[in-house]
Amino acid sequence: MKKLLIAALVMLILGLGGYLIYDQLGGNRPVELSLEAKSPDTLSGQTFRGTPVDKGLEQLFQKIQTTQKLHPGAKLHTIYYTEPAGKLDTLEVFAGINLPFGAPDLELKEFSEGRYILAKVTGNKWVMPSPETIKEKIQDYAKANKLTLSGYYIDKIVSETEVHVIAPVR
């Protein structure tokens, strides 16, 4: 009986400790949703079509990060048109930075939508909500506010602990 009580106490302490760590990393922070009355930033970047293990994907992100270093304040943005289910499935992704003008070898992506839903997500990457969870929250927000989404999502990497998900509204 005494061993059972000690085991239960140890489990309680471990569970409480785990929860406190999870909370400290930002696991309980809510996703902040708002409607922005402006177009998403114009992006300069490139579209990649291939598999996640393709060297071209890594090279694309290296190229964009190199361009980003030349433009302080520019943030990495990604748009996944086709998300892979596995390592060998095809994906189509646009990677770019918020530049209002083109750069050599980069395509300019401008958005015609005049509004978008902004989801601000903060916390450690290990405890952030999944992309599916964020998309569900955005869709629920759009439905509650009688908004029609354009059907794609722009991920803006603000920092290692903050991501903005932009969902243009028709």
Where are the regions that the model predicts?
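A solvent-exposed interaction/effector surface
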Residues: K2-R170
